[in-house]
Amino acid sequence: MLNSVMVVDDESSIRSAVEQWLSLSGFEVQLFSRADECLAQLPKHFPGVILSDVRMPGMTGLELLAEVQRRDADLPVILLTGHGDVPMAVEAMRDGAYDFLEKPFSPETLLGSLRRALDKRRLVLENRALHEQADNRAKLDATLLGVSRGLQTLRRQVLDLATLPV
């Protein structure tokens, strides 16, 4: 679902407040108190955004960002911190963070950033799907040779069936 947000923060009050804002705004929210829990639940082609605190026990938000970038460099990660400074924000953005917000932040600021990040994610996933379809078409054309009406119909049917979630 393209309105999914994984929220990672060790502070339960922040998790609860963010969950309430996002749920009331129509987002599907998953909450995690630790970054490693989030990574364990992160699907391969997650159609959403990760929203993470920077400073947490165990794996930090910056370490989470690095691991997410290793798995999928196009998955938006928005970092939050109450102890931010300009060099940390610059480093995070250079390392691939989609955005860097300082606590306290307004719900409108967070929602705007999430909507832009989700729009970017949607475009990335659509682009990947189109590339996959083009690759499948090229493979099919190399396998099913000929230009007869029957082969053209067969190609269309195979391509239509290939898009079904089986």
Protein language model features and the residues they cover:
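Two-component/phosphorelay signaling modules centered on CheY-like receiver
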Residues: 12-30
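AAA+ ATPase active-site-proximal loops
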Residues: 132-166
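Receiver (REC) domain active-site loop signature in two-component systems and cognate sites
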Residues: 56
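Acidic catalytic/metal-coordinating carboxylates
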Residues: 33-34, 60-63
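C-terminal output helix
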Residues: 85-87, 101, 105-118
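Active-site residues of response regulator receiver
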Residues: 9, 53, 81
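Acidic, metal-coordinating helix/loop segments flanking the phosphotransfer/catalytic sites
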Residues: 31-49
